[in-house]
Amino acid sequence: MTNNCKITFKNQLKALLGKAILLKKKKRKETITEFTQGIQYIIVLVILHYTIPNVITLNTYSPVGLGYPTSGFPLCYVSNVPFNQTSNLHLLLNSTQLPISQIVQFPNEQSLIDSYKSNPQSITYGISFNNIDYQNNILDYNILLNSTFQNTQLISIVQNLFLSTFAEIKGITTTTTTTLSSIEEFPNLTSSVSVSSYLYVIYLPLLFLFSLQQLLVTSVTERKNHIKEVMKVMGLKELVYWVTIIIVQTITNVINILLVMVVLYFTKTLTTSLNPVMLFLQFLLYSFSMVAIGIILSNLVDTPKTASAISSFLLLILVGVSCFYQFYLKSKTSSSWLRSILFLFSPCAFGEFLYKMGNDQQMMLTTNWSDPQVKISFLFLIIDIFLYFTIAWYITELYKDNTDENSITKSFTFFLSLSYWKSIFNLRSSSSSSSLPLLNNNNNCNNNNTSPSSSSSSQSSPLNKPLLSGDSDDDENDIGIRLVNLKKTYKNPITKETVNAVNDVSYTIKKGTILALLGQNGSGKTSTIGMLNGMRSPSSGDAFINGLSIKYDMDKIRENGIGLCHQSNILYDEFTCAEHIALYSRLKGLFVDGGGANGDNKRIMMDNFIMESLGEVNLVDKKDTQSIKLSGGMKRRLCLAISLIGNPSILLLDEPSSGLDSLSQHMICELLQRKKPNKTIILTTHNLDSAELLGDKICIMTSGKVKAMGSSLELKNQFNLGYILTIVYDKSLSLLQPPNINQQFESFFFNKFNDSTQSKQNLKNIQSFYNIFNNNNNENNSNNSDGSSSSSDSSSSKDVLLNIKNNNNNNNNNEERGFSSGQRDLELEYSLTHQSTDVITEFLEELESRQDEFKIKRISMSMTTLDEVFLKVSEEETINKNKQPTS
């Protein structure tokens, strides 16, 4: 089904937001925990707030000598003296010689406190006079001190002022010892150190810990399971992915913040004097910094459990630093540079506001926007958010082009490169990818050969006569994929040696072609697929997909349509088959929901498309089954259906038949054959039967090099593998016939097929055949076993044997091969290159008619399988490696 894909930022954002919401619904326990975790913290905070007794700390003040400067402090007083002592109070105040403008009277202490609350910075101290009697030497007063004022000697200054004035009025000239009866800090505090001062700074920064862990678990799991990267291969923009995470986390955090604030205000842990908007904005800014930290860690950590543990440890450490500063360093130093450095950690900047809030709540004061501590906290939180998101962008870009390996391939100064910004804004010249470089015919596959000096010694090896497609005169419009000296190297983490995963590979694949990529584990198949889909960056060389470079135009390649069936199952355990198809279809921009009747039609089209896609892989009956309940084969079929969404022109299938039964494999082969027109398909597989059935071209890789490439028949001819003819002589002939019993047959056979060869084991089998009976040499029994095992291996082809005539149908196979009682028939094998059916039929008919003449007991013929080609290539590679000198 062909569909017009509308890949836009908006459509992809809607698709991912829908996925996130659906995932939240599916994971109900985690979602409920995420929304209630903050309330659990706050409930503990409320309990501690109301159960832990206040710790009272008394400040000690020592008097200072007379003459200590007293100017500059406004005098606020309250008169509680009897009416007959009013004149005594006025005399005392006038004798202080303070300017009248600095003396302010309040009718009572409550009015003084209210004035202080409205503007704490305007009132430094206050005095409440209770009794002034000069005759009886009585001066009774209370000093109310602003506890936020930094000069702790102010109490002594005020005491000295009034005691010295009182002494002058009395005419006292000698030193008078005065006992200070009481000191009361202003306003009247319940404690000097309250629960709020500590618990806010400790508990509230941990409010978003669980939310941070959930962000990391989700994003790291999607990267670890390759879900994110497959989405990117299908056209997902990196920015859309992270914007979705920010939006989802912000919504989650806002709900958490509102719930927490309701609990705090409802339980009166916070008074209404604290502006709720200020508190909300502080929480919100701090939550943004946590999201940025989560994005940074998600790019650096490989497993969800490790990410969760690291985030917890990191946040606890930062909260500890914040507490150390607020409760210890702050009272020891007033260094602004130290504060600035610490406030670059958002828990420390947030802790500054929380400490101020706790003190104000303790003193029943209003926390104002103009307060320096509030301003500094807001300023540094904004700076932290900008800094953290910049670091997150930098880390993301470093790992962006090699996320399948989670390793750095870009330069650490990539942002200083002009080419980087050109690629960001699509300013790169199109000339670099407008025309494809032509392959050198001499380099099509033989680029991996040894030096010229060694070529002569291996001239006869089929590996030195590679058969490749991709001639230089191919029409560029017909080329789907072209690899040009593509190379990928790694550093072995243990030996530190350079490993060539893909070693200078060059070939082309035409449109409408299926290329089966074969090789042992570690041969470079997956690395090649990874470079073609952009999940791994090439070390050198390039590849062109529909004329676009994988190094410079990967975004365009993905936009134009590329399907990937990753070797891992890119599935969400909680989603059903239908939900997976719907998600990836929306990412591709298919059937985007609209309003009204048009929207209804698109939803109907989406439902029909889901049924069609699942029908192609025979999963309609599993439409509403969660993927975690599917078998391994069903998961692979679902992944294949996902890769076909949007009718991509390029299909990269990495082990699509893994875990499939024979019936499912046959069904997948038929599906790919139907989808093949106008598509370029590369599939890797270890199922050689499927490769032979599907592959228009078959490429065999070993040690990162292309060793052979061509159609199945071409490869068999290249390695002299077409048919295997097996003839058997009865064991009784060893006593009657001369040793050249097969000479007459071979003369006939090689006249018919002069390019055929006989098995190397034939000569040994003939020698053993006669030695057993004529010499009765027991030592040759071991040779018999060797010969029979070789011939058994040679005749163990998977195809159905064509039995022309069997003169002893009742004999057991093992008895025929001489494994019983040390006796066996003589078995000889001959290899024929691929021949037409008519030639083979004519030959077999003639051979059958002359079977008695040649004294042949049995004739069989099998067709060579791709397994034998694969084994030939592997054997040749092993021999070549053993011949190489070791350093």
UniProtKB/Swiss-Prot annotation:
Organism of origin is Dictyostelium discoideum
The record's InterPro entries line, in alphabetical order, gives: AAA+_ATPase, ABC2_TM, ABC_transporter-like_ATP-bd, ABC_transporter-like_CS, ABCA, P-loop_NTPase
Tell me where it resides: Membrane
Stretches of Low complexity bias are at 443-469, 774-797
Membrane topology note? Multi-pass membrane protein
- Family assignment from sequence similarity: Belongs to the ABC transporter superfamily. ABCA family.
**Protein name as it appears in the record:** ABC transporter A family member 10
Q: What is its main location?
A: membrane
Q: Which PROSITE patterns match?
A: ABC_TRANSPORTER_1, ABC_TRANSPORTER_2
> Where in this chain does the record put each ABC transporter domain?
481-728
GO terms in the biological process aspect are: lipid transport; sorocarp morphogenesis
> Which CDD domains does the annotation name?
ABC_subfamily_A
Molecular function (GO) terms for this protein are:
ABC-type transporter activity; ATP binding; ATP hydrolysis activity; ATPase-coupled transmembrane transporter activity; lipid transporter activity
Membrane-spanning parts: 38-58, 198-218, 245-265, 277-297, 309-329, 335-355, 376-396
Keywords, A to Z? ATP-binding, Membrane, Nucleotide-binding, Transmembrane, Transmembrane helix, Transport
Q: Does the record carry Nucleotide-binding as a key word? A: yes
Q: Which residues bind ATP?
A: G519, Q520, N521, G522, S523, G524, K525, T526
Q: Which GO terms describe its cellular component?
A: intracellular membrane-bounded organelle; membrane
- Pfam families for this protein: ABC2_membrane_3 (PF12698), ABC_tran (PF00005)
| Keyword presence, Transport | yes
Which residues does the annotated region (Disordered) include? 443-474, 774-799
